[in-house]
Amino acid sequence: MSRPTHVTSGPYAPPAPARELTAVSADGARLHVEVHGPADATVPTVVLAHGWTCSTAFWAAQIRDLAADHRVIAYDQRGHGRSPASDACGTDALADDLEAVLAATLRPGEKAVLVGHSMGGMTLMAAATRPRFREHAVAALLCSTGSSRLVAEARVLPLPAGRLRTGITKRVLGSRAPLGPITPVARAILKYATMGPGSSPGMVEACARIVHACPRAVRHAWSQVLDLLDLDHGVRELTVPTAVVAGTADRLTPLAHARALVATLPNCVGLTELTGLGHMTPVEAPDVVTGRIRELVADYAQIKEGA
């Protein structure tokens, strides 16, 4: 049976890109990249980095809106979507891959607003000191992410914080078991773990298609990276104006992570707390997330490009 990929109709169906290309990372890993929107060099550019077990399809709502008047670049993290898997998994690889995408898609000195969800946000933290990041990033948006203690603070299991919950959570998130077909039970589990209780069936279906399409070996390999994650130093190096978005019902990266980011970021320009929403904020609140991106572009990218 073929693996489900993404929904093909409705607001969460991925739009066709204007151009596709392959970026080659430092270790030779090949990354699938999509470019959406006008080719006009005067329009602002936004770069989207998705999270663990997701793909470019996760950004469908943002791409559809922003591509009307922005150049939008989205790429599949290694092993996800149409980017082949690699033996190298780690925060250095995430940073290398983002640098490769920036080099392949942006002109020298071109500025862009960089947006990361979950592991995509961690990618921005990991790359904060890299030369290409500093050359191109004019502002950043971190959605539903954290910099350390991810497993210890996750609330996927209804248990009190402590060694027991941490140990079981580690085994659950790091499981090598296949997710299987998308059934009503599978949808209910995914909704409970990753989305707010008010998420619509269409939102849940879109996320289920994307997550279930991630190969289990890739899911397991990157879960080990997230388990050991420590990017607190990267947050302190993220000096561009940075906004944070988080759901108050996020079980994977609870609100405490967002508040810690706000307290640590050198140049935080706001925290948006979305009441009752879970981990999949770009899908659960597409208008809010897209609106924050547009605000960052208006406040920073257009000023820089016109200077």
Where are these regions (language model features)?
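Active-site loop/oxyanion-hole signature of alpha/beta-hydrolase fold enzymes
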Residues: 29, 64, 73, 77-119, ...
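Conserved HGGG/HGGXW glycine-rich cap/lid loop of the alpha/beta-hydrolase fold
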Residues: 29-85, 104
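Active-site glycine-rich loops that stabilize anionic/oxyanionic intermediates
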Residues: 51-54, 118-119, 146
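Flexible "cap/lid" loop of the alpha/beta hydrolase fold
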Residues: 129-173
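Conserved alpha/beta-hydrolase catalytic His-Asp/Glu region
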Residues: 148, 175-236
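Short beta-strand/loop motif that positions the catalytic acidic residue
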Residues: 238, 244-246, 250
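Conserved alpha/beta-hydrolase "acid-adjacent" motif
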Residues: 251-257
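Catalytic histidine-centered segment of alpha/beta-hydrolase-like enzymes
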Residues: 252, 271-291
